[in-house]
């Protein structure tokens, strides 16, 4: 073993790394957990007491020589300015392109929905997120004691009890109908707020789509065809739609719209609770009282309206199982949508 130590010491002394990569190779070869010196210490433990006494100091000195050499060259190489050693580098080439971010999935879906409805004549409208009680509740036929008016469901402004954060974009429908004469065909997409616990399935802030059409002789058949056109444009021609009766204060009759589950293709899974269907939006014919509140004669004009949560649509389209991902700004999540932009 003494001869082996002499050979390794000679090899260490002759080693003169010129780059950090060569220095790392030196460390791995001699000082790493599987390096030569570590293996020598393992073999040293199996020697007789007499051999240990003769070789112990020599082995420790060898390790110290290697460590000192590594330390000296590490200091020298790390302080030396990095030089360009690539003689084949072409300085006439353009620089690498900047790494661009991706659009948010909600923005992608919002633009897609607006594009679909613009093709059939819907105008894009907007309204305030801080709303008054009349436009958010009263004009939409909510009774004074309706549960939605409770502080447990709605964010009210403490200094002004009549002012609140809108709970739906239907308030935009009222503002547009007050300021325009029929025929009116409009769609609005924006943030809404509800006093709900933040979880994988609910949030205190989300986006809602609201669209309506008012004209003479508007029928439920038109509503059905518009919704079928929208769902086929968004999800594909193979989409199936189911209409169920429901209740909303601002429409009569009111319906819920279901589509066949995109996860299990209608066969039944945990997402659709093994029914094969997923609720996707609410719709109906505008209640005559709502038209009156907007100074529109319900004996002359009729209309339909429908609304849906944008995040819910996005979760179905992109198979996302946690609503909170939309607001956490996790780059790992967002960069997956470059292909959809």
Swiss-Prot record:
Cellular component annotations (GO), alphabetically ordered: cytoplasm
EC number: 6.1.1.20
Gene3D superfamilies: Bira Bifunctional Protein, Domain 2
Compartments it resides in: Cytoplasm
UniProt-recorded Gene Ontology molecular function terms: ATP binding; magnesium ion binding; phenylalanine-tRNA ligase activity; tRNA binding
Cofactor note: Binds 2 magnesium ions per tetramer.
HAMAP family: Phe_tRNA_synth_alpha1
Protein known as: Phenylalanine--tRNA ligase alpha subunit
């Amino acid at each position: 073993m003494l001869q082996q130590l002499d050979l390794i010491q000679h090899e260490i002394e002759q080693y003169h790394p010129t780059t950090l990569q060569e220095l790392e190779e030196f460390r791995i070869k001699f000082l790493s957990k599987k390096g030569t010196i570590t293996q020598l210490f393992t073999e040293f433990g199996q020697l007789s007491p007499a051999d240990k006494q003769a070789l112990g100091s020599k082995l420790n000195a060898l390790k110290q020589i290697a460590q000192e050499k590594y330390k000296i060259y590490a200091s020298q190489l790390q302080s030396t300015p990095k030089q360009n050693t690539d003689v084949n580098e072409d300085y006439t080439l353009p620089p690498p392109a900047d790494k661009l971010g991706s659009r948010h999935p909600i923005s992608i879906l919002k633009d897609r929905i607006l594009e679909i409805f613009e093709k059939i004549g819907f105008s894009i409208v907007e309204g305030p997120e801080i709303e008054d009680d009349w436009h958010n509740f009263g004009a939409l036929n909510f009774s004074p004691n309706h549960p939605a008016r409770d502080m447990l469901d709605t964010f009210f402004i403490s200094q002004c009890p009549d002012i609140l954060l809108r709970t739906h974009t239907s308030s935009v429908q009222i503002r547009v109908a007050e300021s325009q004469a029929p025929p009116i065909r409009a769609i609005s997409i924006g943030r809404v707020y509800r006093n709900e616990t933040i979880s994988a399935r609910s949030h205190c802030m989300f986006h809602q789509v609201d669209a309506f059409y008012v004209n003479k002789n508007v029928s439920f058949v038109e509503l059905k065809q518009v919704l079928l056109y929208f769902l086929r444009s968004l999800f594909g021609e193979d989409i199936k739609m189911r209409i169920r009766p429901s209740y909303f204060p601002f429409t009569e009759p009111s319906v819920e719209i279901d589509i066949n589950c995109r996860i299990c293709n209608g066969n039944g899974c945990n997402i659709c609770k093994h029914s094969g269907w997923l609720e996707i939006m609410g719709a109906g014919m505008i209640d005559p009282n709502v038209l009156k509140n907007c100074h529109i004669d319900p004996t002359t004009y009729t209309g339909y309206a429908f609304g849906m949560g944008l995040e819910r649509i996005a979760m179905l389209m992109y198979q996302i199982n946690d609503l909170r991902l939309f607001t956490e700004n996790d780059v790992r999540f967002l960069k997956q949508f470059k292909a959809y932009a």
